[in-house]
Curated annotation (Swiss-Prot):
Modified residues (N6-succinyllysine): K7, K11, K16, K40
Positions carrying N6-acetyllysine: K16
Name of the protein: Hemoglobin subunit alpha
Protein family membership: Belongs to the globin family.
């Protein structure tokens, strides 16, 4: 459960991400594909090379979903319901992949905003991404 301080930290961190969200989403996906090659199996139709338009487009989708989650941090289950259905019933993504992408997002954010990535912000973002992952996997059951 996100505390009021966590919510404040997440909103402040995401505000700093701003217009770079799509780029950071794509970078996190690239990082995930390189670090955890098994995740590529969900994207057999993608050009997974560095700078790929398909990876950039999907990175923007990831970033847009996270922006939506930040905007609706008090009601993420409703805000992410359609996305949860998509990943659980149509795409059938292994839930562990959300944790892997979350880790890669944290690394990406830390690389781009080292001064802002304090232990408290890191912990808040980690809790937030874990909450998003929980919501996205809630319909697997």
């Amino acid at each position: 459960v996100l505390s009021p301080a966590d919510k404040t930290n997440v909103k402040a961190a995401w505000e700093k991400v701003g217009s770079h969200a799509g780029d950071y989403g794509a970078e996190a996906l690239e990082r995930m594909f390189l670090s955890f090659p098994t995740t590529k199996t969900y994207f057999p139709h993608f050009d997974l090379s560095h700078g790929s338009a398909q990876v950039k487009a999907h990175g923007k989708k990831v970033a847009d979903a996270l922006t939506n989650a930040v905007s609706h941090v008090d009601d993420m289950p409703s805000a992410l319901s359609a996305l949860s259905d998509l990943h659980a019933h149509k795409l059938r993504v292994d839930p562990v992949n959300f944790k892997l992408l979350s880790h890669c997002l944290l690394v990406t954010l830390a690389c781009h905003h080292p001064a802002d990535f304090t232990p408290a912000v890191h912990a808040s973002l980690d809790k937030f991404l874990a909450s998003v992952s929980t919501v996205l996997t809630s319909k697997y059951r």
